[in-house]
């Protein structure tokens, strides 16, 4: 029998959920029939999910998500959270929290934290030369050094993360959970700036340069989020969860930065993972460590299947931690609808849900 303190987290990319006539990319719109089909599919998935906390991505309109919950018959069961009151421009994240869980606080991040900087100066030759190498011509020493100078001027998220503090309305022994709902920059190449003075020179290489720009931005966003997470997680026992379309695989550099690469316990006699103050554990990895079926994916591109949508949890959800409050039960992925030529009424991403049982250490 399920304990009311058990909890499940889900991530769902809505794939451009917008009201009829509302503008999307390149002026695209839905007619009423297309909107009805999209709302019907979204509502059906919400009913299947049965998750306590859901993070959404690619939402254009508040009303569209309200309509989906109404169609699913779940309006009274969930409280919805958006990045701000009123309307917004472009796609955003949103969230839903099911009773008896409640939203205690909400916070949006747009600017990178002040501590976040991706710059590195040129190293002066005096710092490169060792005392016993003073007789070596400086130009020869410099030629053998790696040039690590960098100046990356990104200072805001492309899509604002939303942080919720989620509490239990009936149990005082359950600590509030800090939930970050995220959507990092996509892998799709960024369009080049046509006004750039070297645009014509760059144009033949637009795909490579655009992909590099997207990768750099996604890495910067992961780093900024890591800085924010560390400020919230260090030196306290606040359970923390990161949900969302992170647009990279679990072993990618993006996820390594974001998770801080905690150790997993892979055999019973190990003492690994007893403590990790600000690391985040991947529900995908936890599922893979306990099942013979390792074929998990939430996205398909040119035949390549990978997990881009993640549930990352702090040590309070890891069963081998001395600070455990919950233990991982299972990860489920709905991905039958994810095909190269998927139906526009559905999504181009799989939907993930991770369940955790209340089991304090």
Q: Each predicted region: which residue ranges?
A:
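Active-site-proximal beta-strand elements of phosphoester/diester hydrolases
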Residues: 6-19, 176-185, 205-211
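A long, amphipathic alpha-helix that forms part
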Residues: 208-236
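Metal-dependent phosphoester-hydrolase catalytic domains
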Residues: 1, 103-107, 119, 156, ...
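Short, solvent-exposed loop/turn elements at domain surfaces
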Residues: 17-22, 188-190, 320-321
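N-terminal, active-site-proximal structural segment of metallo-dependent hydrolase catalytic domains
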Residues: 1-93, 199-201, 237, 326, ...
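Catalytic metal-binding/acid-base residues of hydrolase active sites
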Residues: 15, 59-60, 185, 246-249
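Structured beta-strand-rich core segments of catalytic domains in phosphoester-bond hydrolases
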Residues: 59-63, 67-187
């Amino acid at each position: 029998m399920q304990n009311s303190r058990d909890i499940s987290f889900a991530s769902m990319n809505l794939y451009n959920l917008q009201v009829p006539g509302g503008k999307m990319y390149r002026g695209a719109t839905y007619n009423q029939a297309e909107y009805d089909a999209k709302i019907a599919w979204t509502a059906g998935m919400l009913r299947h999910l049965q998750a306590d906390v859901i993070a959404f991505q690619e939402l254009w309109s508040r009303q569209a998500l309200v309509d989906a919950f109404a169609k699913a018959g779940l309006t009274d069961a969930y409280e919805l959270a958006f990045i701000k009151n009123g309307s917004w421009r472009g796609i955003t994240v949103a969230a839903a929290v099911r009773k008896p869980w409640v939203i205690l606080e909400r916070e949006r991040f747009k600017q990178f934290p002040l501590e976040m900087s991706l710059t590195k100066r040129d190293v002066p030759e005096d710092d490169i030369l060792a005392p016993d190498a003073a007789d070596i011509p400086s130009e020869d020493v410099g030629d053998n050094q790696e040039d690590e100078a960098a100046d990356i001027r990104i200072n805001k998220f492309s899509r604002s993360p939303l942080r919720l503090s989620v509490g239990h309305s009936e149990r005082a022994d359950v600590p509030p959970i800090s939930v970050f709902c995220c959507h990092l920059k996509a892998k799709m190449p960024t369009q080049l700036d046509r006004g750039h003075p070297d645009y014509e020179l760059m144009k033949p290489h637009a795909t490579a340069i655009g992909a590099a720009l997207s990768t750099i931005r996604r890495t910067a966003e992961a780093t900024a989020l890591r800085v924010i997470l560390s400020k919230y997680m260090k030196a306290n026992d606040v359970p923390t969860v990161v949900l969302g379309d992170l647009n990279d695989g679990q072993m990618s550099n993006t996820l390594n930065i974001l998770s801080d690469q905690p150790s997993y316990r892979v055999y019973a006699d190990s003492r690994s993972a007893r403590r990790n103050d600000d690391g985040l554990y991947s529900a995908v990895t936890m599922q893979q460590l306990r099942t013979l079926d390792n074929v998990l994916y939430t996205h398909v591109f040119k035949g390549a299947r990978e997990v881009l949508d993640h549930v990352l949890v702090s040590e309070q959800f890891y069963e081998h931690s001395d600070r455990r409050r919950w233990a991982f039960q299972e990860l489920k992925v709905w991905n039958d609808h994810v095909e190269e030529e998927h139906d526009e009424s559905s999504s181009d991403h799989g939907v993930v849900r991770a369940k955790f049982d209340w089991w304090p250490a």
